[in-house]
């Protein structure tokens, strides 16, 4: 397992976590075994916006004795009073739900307390007016909530809430379908979504990824907007390549599904190549690097995807990205303009010219 550091909290978080949308489907015995295997395999981050309330005692049974090794993100607004998932902006309901979750998880603290499911500005206004944000802040002062998160599918709302509140982690729906305008939660333009990634990277706000497979749509050739099924591994790699991403949270409910996720690190590079998405990217995305590294190997040894990522972040004002760029073994000035990458790029990026542009830009920064 590989890990990434949340710059705002210092937490060391596994690149692959577990979402709980259907954890309950494995039943107590099967799901407990799956969760124990996940932690044994190095997974340490778990989202608890569960599809059913029965997931919480499963987590409590499976992980209560491993609590100091894991992180929970718990949502203030998720209501399980009816048994299944519900959404509420009523403070009394939210308070009772969080207390119930903690009791069933057999824990007394929350690693990341989330401002839950804010998809419209009116949601945020009601959330604050009803005192739910104040509730989270009070619990943070008491040490019950360690850090504050936000879950949303809408770039404009995310930007507004990040302006208004101090956020340490964002839960955002990230996959190639949504990023290029296809799917139920494909909110915001390609550029607006990219701005969220870049802002989070710049400000040190980690992103945990929900819906990495677009609800399974991307795994089915008939449903996929790309006309071809992607694998779970391609979707995970795509998400991890976006700026700001700390962890991807696929669902799982049994050991077999967990083992399949853990096998991500055993895959050859070609199994992770998601460049097929170029078949359906919009015109405004053509000519823009998506860091897929389909252009590898570079004859001069450049990591073209990473060089592009640092450049995009630097232009967005991320000073740390400039320092990271300068520590690369080979940078844009080492490009020999052989054209190998230009001929291989499925997104029609003239990388040879771009390397000259990047080199000049980075050298201009003192």
Regions found by a protein language model. Name each.
Residues 1-76, 80, 141:
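N-terminal binding-site loop/beta-alpha segment at the start of enzyme catalytic domains
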């Amino acid at each position: 397992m590989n890990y990434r550091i949340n710059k705002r909290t210092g937490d060391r978080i596994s690149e692959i976590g577990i979402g709980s949308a259907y954890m309950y489907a494995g039943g107590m015995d099967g799901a407990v075994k799956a969760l124990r295997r996940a932690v044994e395999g190095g997974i340490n981050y778990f989202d608890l916006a569960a599809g059913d309330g029965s997931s919480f005692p499963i987590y409590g049974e499976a992980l209560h004795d491993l609590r100091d090794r894991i992180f929970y993100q718990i949502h203030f607004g998720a209501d399980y009073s009816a048994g299944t998932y519900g959404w509420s902006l009523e403070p009394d309901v939210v308070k009772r739900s969080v207390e119930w979750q903690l009791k069933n998880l057999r824990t007394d603290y929350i690693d990341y307390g989330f401002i839950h499911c804010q998809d419209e500005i009116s949601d945020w206004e009601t959330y604050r007016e009803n005192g739910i944000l104040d509730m989270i802040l009070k619990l943070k002062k008491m040490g019950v909530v360690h850090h504050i998160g936000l879950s949303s599918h809408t770039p404009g709302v995310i930007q507004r809430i990040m302006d208004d509140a101090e956020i340490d982690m964002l839960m955002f729906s990230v996959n190639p379908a949504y990023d290029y305008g296809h799917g139920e939660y494909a909110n915001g333009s390609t550029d607006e979504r990219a701005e969220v990634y870049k802002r989070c990277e710049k400000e040190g706000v980690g992103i945990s990824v929900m819906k990495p497979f677009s609800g399974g749509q991307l795994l089915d050739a008939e449903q996929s907007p790309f006309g071809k099924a992607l694998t779970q591994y391609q979707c995970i790699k795509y998400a991890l390549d976006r700026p700001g991403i700390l962890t991807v949270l696929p669902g799982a409910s049994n050991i077999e599904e967990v083992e399949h996720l853990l096998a991500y690190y055993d895959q050859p590079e070609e199994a992770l190549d998601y460049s097929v998405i170029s078949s359906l990217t919009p015109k405004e995305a053509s000519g823009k690097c998506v860091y897929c590294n389909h252009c590898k190997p570079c004859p001069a040894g450049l990591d073209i995807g990473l060089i592009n990522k640092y450049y995009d972040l630097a232009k967005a004002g991320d000073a740390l990205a400039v320092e990271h760029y300068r520590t690369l073994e080979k940078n844009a000035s080492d490009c020999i303009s052989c054209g190998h990458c230009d001929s291989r790029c499925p997104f029609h990026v003239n990388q040879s010219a771009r390397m000259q542009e990047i080199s000049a830009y980075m050298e201009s920064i003192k």
